[in-house]
Amino acid sequence: MRTVLLVGNWKMNKTASEAAVFVRELKERLPAPSTTIELVVAPPFTALESVRIALGPSSPIQLGAQNLFWDDRGAYTGEVSAPMLTDLGCRYVILGHSERRILFGEQSDHIHKKIRAAHNHGLRPILCIGETLAERDNGTTDHVLTQQLRDGLSGLATETLAAVTVAYEPVWAIGTGKSATVDQAVAAHRTIRRVLAAIASPSIADGTRILYGGSVTPHNIESLLASDQIDGALVGGACLQVESFATIATVASVTRSIGV
């Protein structure tokens, strides 16, 4: 069984000092370390160092980033490279989030280069894909997911493809309080795994963790993880409060430990 992955995407929230306090409190509230789940927090760039220090050398929580640039160095004002992130202790990086695509015009070819750069420097890329409400309503969800996967992953080396985690985030469910139904999420995850098998191989597709992201809360995490097609969650708003994120982690650990 694939290990559940829970990723807390803080977005543009928490100063460095606030982040350190938050992480110390979170560590105290988490369930005992488990082989059934893996936890990642992705603070803003400015808080990565303080979070790394607060986590300590043997923390069960891993450090992630919210973006990177595809070149190692250069005249790219405001950007951060993969070597900079690995030097700070990051293990994961979120790429292609819908907010990056919509607000900043991030294109698929850029995301493709970022995935390659991340893997080349030992980071595990989390590729975000998902449809808008209009695309779901007109019945093109599968087409959109297929195209985003092909644009992001086609042509990458086998070892890079094997390192990728995919996060399905229906755009209409992000920050809206609306969540896809379990049936909707499972159908999308099955499409993603089928396309991954075609792009990479059936074995890579079977081993790839596919997360759900879109108004994940302590109240719906159990029902989401009841399906073996859903391998974890990319958590937004609910990860900004210690109690809610710790509860999500606890429920996830119990759910998968008892094989629900």
Identify what each model region corresponds to.
Residues 1-260:
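Active-site loop-to-helix "anion-binding N-cap" substructures in soluble metabolic enzymes
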